[in-house]
From Swiss-Prot:
GO terms for molecular function: asparaginyl-tRNA synthase (glutamine-hydrolyzing) activity; ATP binding; glutaminyl-tRNA synthase (glutamine-hydrolyzing) activity. Keywords: ATP-binding, Ligase, Nucleotide-binding, Protein biosynthesis. Heterotrimer of A, B and C subunits. GO terms for biological process: glutaminyl-tRNAGln biosynthesis via transamidation; translation. The gene is gatB. It is an enzyme of class 6 (ligase). It comes from the Bacteria. Pfam families: GatB_N, GatB_Yqey. Allows the formation of correctly charged Asn-tRNA(Asn) or Gln-tRNA(Gln) through the transamidation of misacylated Asp-tRNA(Asn) or Glu-tRNA(Gln) in organisms which lack either or both of asparaginyl-tRNA or glutaminyl-tRNA synthetases. The reaction takes place in the presence of glutamine and ATP through an activated phospho-Asp-tRNA(Asn) or phospho-Glu-tRNA(Gln). NCBIfam families: gatB, PRK05477.1-2, PRK05477.1-4. Belongs to the GatB/GatE family. GatB subfamily. This is Aspartyl/glutamyl-tRNA(Asn/Gln) amidotransferase subunit B.
């Protein structure tokens, strides 16, 4: 019997705000000492009252609009009650039946080039919990720094049928979250966490199978691995006549397996009811229109425009449109250099600049202070005018990257201007011909590509400063003269 997989994802994204979801407490806890980013609200002291973080509301709406969600006129916070050491109040303020975003979609591109729509059921705001630090078998410690940090949970429809689709969906969603400045995208620090709900059913059966939730996946690679394992595990259970239990399982990366953690709760177990200390939020249509006007051009739209407007390759367009900082940098330089120079601008950024950034472990923001739009435009201009060749241009670029000096200053200081004097290059051509009689013989016997070797010899002798077109013409003239 063949089985069909059904996969839905719940993505928990910490929202980038200065303060926490319901108080003015510092939300930048990542490198802070344990329990140093807390206040009365964070740890649920009696008598404290929550105040909604407006920036978290704004960013949640931005993401919802980017995912083509509806933004209801009213949304409401509720209490989700459960007892756990990392939840000091014994309830979490979240959204239950009135979330801020509903009925969206995200389009992913599959490995075969086809696209697939994945529905977004909802996205709702809540406060994050604290973190447990497990010691030996006798105790665990609780760090409440994370408690109260704004969290946006994005719940997909169960539209995915393969682990690859789940990975592509999560990767695409992360790209949009980071592009909008809603989330840092850091899975290792827990700023972005993904839970998967997965089931299988006999092929052709409409009714879904029993759902299993998988947690503890700290990378998209592990998400895919965990789903592959879990699908195989469930299929094996059914083939052996067993029954799938509705439960929560954790991914063990070292062992490459999922392990049972607890039976899966139902909604009524949490005793949801409206948060009495917070009134419903009214999101006027004017406010939503203002948020829509804030939306930048998203990666997919940029990618398509870079192809049509600038004629870039798909690879370059993808590299340049994927991150907002990179896209803004590229477009700023194109605005200076002109649309006609978009391709050379793209080549320099995706080639030499990315290589040097990777080697130097710097950020683009740091490098952009040295490789300015004016400097890169100037470099493209001197290459186009034939003042320097491509080999020397890379030397100039590296020096510009290192020092921030202008290309003209570097060329003049190092004497790198291209040699186009025919008398000088004619002599260099004669020297190359004299030093390579076998290559000359090959050329004269009809192996015309052999001249490229001679061009290379002249370029080496002139340290890359010779004009290759002039060199080739000089070589042809001298070779023809010796017939």
């Amino acid at each position: 019997m063949k089985y069909t997989a059904t996969i839905g994802l719940e993505v928990h994204a910490q929202i980038l705000t200065k303060s926490k979801m319901f108080s003015g407490c510092n939300a930048a806890y990542a490198s802070a000492p344990a329990n140093s980013c807390i206040d009365e609200v964070s740890i649920g002291l009696p008598g404290t009252l929550p105040v909604v973080n407006q920036e978290a509301i704004r960013k949640a709406a931005l993401l919802g609009l980017a995912l083509n969600c509806e933004i209801p006129e009213y949304c409401e916070f509720s209490r989700k009650s459960y007892t756990y050491p990392d939840l000091p109040k014994a309830w979490q303020i979240t959204m239950y039946d009135k979330p801020i975003c509903i009925n969206g979609e995200l389009e992913i591109t599959l490995g075969n080039g086809e696209t697939k729509r994945v529905g977004i059921t909802r996205a709702h705001l809540e406060e994050d919990t604290g973190m447990l630090q497990h010691g030996d078998e006798t105790h665990s410690l609780v760090d409440y720094n994370r408690s109260g940090v704004p969290l946006l949970e994005i719940v997909s429809e169960p539209d995915m049928t393969t682990p690859e689709e789940a990975r592509l969906y999560a990767t695409k969603l992360r790209q949009i979250l980071v592009f909008l400045g809603v989330n840092s995208g850091n899975l290792e620090e827990g700023a972005l966490r993904v839970d998967a709900n997965v089931s299988i059913r006999p092929e052709g059966q409409k009714e879904f199978g029993t759902k299993v939730e998988i947690k503890n996946m700290n990378s998209f690679r592990n998400l895919e691995r965990a789903l592959v394992y879990e699908l195989e595990r469930q299929e094996k259970v059914l083939r052996e006549g067993g029954t799938i239990i509705q439960e929560t399982r954790g991914w063990d990366d070292a062992a490459g397996i999922t392990l049972s953690q607890r039976s899966k709760e139902h909604a009524h177990d949490y005793r949801y009811f409206p948060e009495p200390d917070l009134p419903p939020l009214e999101l006027s249509r004017e406010w939503v229109a203002e948020r829509r006007a804030e939306l930048p051009e998203l990666p997919d739209a940029k990618f398509a425009r870079y192809l049509s407007e600038f004629g870039l390759s798909k690879q370059d367009a993808a590299l340049l449109s994927g991150e907002r900082e990179t896209a803004d940098y590229f477009e700023t330089i194109v605005a200076t250099a002109g649309a006609a120079n978009a391709k050379p601008v793209a080549n320099w950024i995706t080639g030499e600049l990315f290589r040097l950034i990777k080697d130097g472990a710097e950020t683009l923001a740091e490098v952009a202070k040295r490789v300015t739009p004016a400097n890169l435009t100037s470099l493209i201009d001197v290459v186009a005018k034939g003042e320097i060749g491509s080999t020397v241009a890379k030397q100039v670029f590296e020096e510009m990257y290192r020092t921030g000096e202008t290309p003209t200053a570097i060329i003049n200081a190092k004497g790198l201007r291209q040699i186009s004097d025919s008398s000088v290059l004619t002599q260099a051509a004669r020297d190359a011909i004299a030093a390579n009689p076998k290559v000359v013989a090959d050329y004269k016997s009809g192996k015309l590509p052999a001249i490229k070797f001679l061009v290379g010899q002249v370029m080496r002798a002139t340290k890359g400063q010779a004009n290759p077109q002039v060199v080739e013409e000089a070589l042809k003239t001298e070779l023809d003269a010796t017939n």
